[in-house]
Amino acid sequence: TDLYGSASRKKPILCQSCHADPALGAPGKKGHNNFSTALHGWHANYMYVEGGRACAMCHPAASDGNTRCNRGIHPQVGKNCSNCHGTLEEHATGLLNAQKDNPSSQRLVKNLKTTVAEVKPRSPWIQEPECLGCHRSFKQPEKGSSGVNTWNEAFTQLYRVRTDNTGMRCAACHNSPHSEYPAVNAFGKNQDNTQPMQYGKSPLPIGAESTCKVCHMKEMEYSGHHPNMVRPFRNRVVLSH
């Protein structure tokens, strides 16, 4: 390829013109790994960085960076990117396994070492870590639980678009992915908690601690949106951060 030459002539080639990308609806070219597989598969072979630090080399997730996109409750209770998405090697292996018929996938995956015996194949942007893989029956995760290798099956099961028993999206009460309530933002204490602070005077998820009247006209006595929601908030220690 002459990618650098094209770019220097002010005619850059879009990566997704060859590498398929579900996020853009780009079909790519047959025989090429999709965009996410190509990127993660390559870097996993050359980057020897552990845990979430590997992700932060490219993604804006560093705790001391300018964006700090991972500012929800999970890092506050000691979790990093790899607890849900796997190590860089595991993340890449799942993508490569989904395209195992491509020669480049076979070449890239053979050198990768993972802590999981067999990483299940997955499609990028469509199959992501399943929340209920750790929060089984919407309960507190068991010690040592991990979201790795429990991918959702369909786009409609993604946290950002998933709906509860009443048709409400999860994010309507819990906030956006990676900034779940109560979120911590270094650029403003409750900058990501505007909605619960406005309606409930608390940074906790909407309706937490049996504050259903934030939305409902009367006290609710059962878990209508999902099981196990009428209970005290578990991780109150994060409120002191």
Across the structure, where does each feature detected by a protein language model lie?
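Inter-heme linker and motif-flanking segments adjacent to c-type heme-binding CXXCH motifs
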Residues: 2-4, 21-241
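Core catalytic machinery and nucleic-acid-binding channels of phosphodiester-processing enzymes
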Residues: 2-7, 12, 16
